[in-house]
């Protein structure tokens, strides 16, 4: 038997508050897996003009509030004020998540908030046992009375109140502001004059599909696939129908991939992984958006979404599942599909290992080729000047007016012998001495004297840069 020291077991420390972006708020609105409340802290006029659907308004107190003077309210009971909204009255007892937004980002110091909340909690606990009172600036007094509330600090004050009173409720703030959300998801906003404040952009009160990849991949059920207005709002161009019992509703309007698959553990969903991934990538290349669905958006459609994430983003099954569940909390592939996904992970791992091994081999071959390209300098020079008029090689230097340095010292030349290291052409030119007597004298001089190869070079003439080297013709 293994004994566990319970003294060392500490509960996971949760963050004080959470931050979300526009897509997260959109997905939270579709989440049926947890209870939530959305709080709008803007003015009543702004809220009535337009707001995120299903949100409730907790506006700053109006100037008609008792003890209101110069933008401040004396002796303000914040808990009672929030409780005047029936939906928000018991928010910390009913809801698992509280999402709060305003018309601008929240300005706060997290260290200051933690210190204030910690101090207020200790003071409140001491008050219940010693009947001491808290400071005038405390939010957490027995009667939740704020001695002096500045209306301009409304967002900050309410946020501190929620953090202080949250219990097990997660406090989530959306920093983008209403205007940003309306820009990204206008169909998820409604004016108060709308017949149903929970309806959304022609989609009625029905939930939209979850957004797995921003502006590209959506996961949902049959109701989403059959709702033309939702497809228009989301700009869907392709659909993947993983349910054999469902017909393609708009085959004349959208491109479909149909799987005809039952939600049974023994059903072969593996064979659809590669074709579906190819279909999704084709949609991406065309700049489209794809909705992947089955009957409920829980098992079959989720499985192929996970397969796509595993291959395209090199995720493990576990990582892909966690990522997808953060976007859609109700996903739950059956155990047979989970096994096939894990088999697919092994297949992908082998493929990645082969690719990595091939890359290493190619790199090693490249390194060897680079190391074996060393050629003696003298041979390179000979290669470069073997054809002085050719410049086909971009690395060849311009033709110089001097000959390349020979690899070995020049040989001694007697009479009409030509040194082999230097490619010398003997031609007749306009500069040749025409006087026969001079030619004979020069020939006699060649017979009687021995000169080195270097001295002979000095006697050579070069009429032009590209003309061949000329030697005087001997009469012998």
UniProtKB/Swiss-Prot annotation:
Any single Gene Ontology cellular-component annotation: cytoplasm
Enzyme class: hydrolase
Record's keyword annotation contains Hydrolase: yes
EC numbers, comma separated: 3.1.3.16, 3.1.3.48
GO molecular function terms attached to this record: MAP kinase tyrosine phosphatase activity; MAP kinase tyrosine/serine/threonine phosphatase activity; phosphoprotein phosphatase activity; protein serine/threonine phosphatase activity; protein tyrosine/threonine phosphatase activity
PROSITE patterns: TYR_PHOSPHATASE_1, TYR_PHOSPHATASE_2, TYR_PHOSPHATASE_DUAL
Similarity comment text for this entry: Belongs to the protein-tyrosine phosphatase family. Non-receptor class dual specificity subfamily.
Active site: 294
Biased composition (Basic and acidic residues): 442-461
Domain Rhodanese: 32-190
Comp. bias (Low complexity): 425-436
Family matches, as Pfam families: DSPc (PF00782), Rhodanese (PF00581)
GO biological process, alphabetically ordered: negative regulation of MAPK cascade; response to cisplatin; signal transduction; sorocarp development
Keywords: Hydrolase, Protein phosphatase
Task of the protein: Has a dual specificity toward Ser/Thr and Tyr-containing proteins.
Domain Tyrosine-protein phosphatase stretches: 208-350
Catalytic activity line of the entry: O-phospho-L-tyrosyl-[protein] + H2O = L-tyrosyl-[protein] + phosphate; O-phospho-L-seryl-[protein] + H2O = L-seryl-[protein] + phosphate; O-phospho-L-threonyl-[protein] + H2O = L-threonyl-[protein] + phosphate
Region (Disordered) residue spans: 425-476
Protein name: Probable rhodanese domain-containing dual specificity protein phosphatase
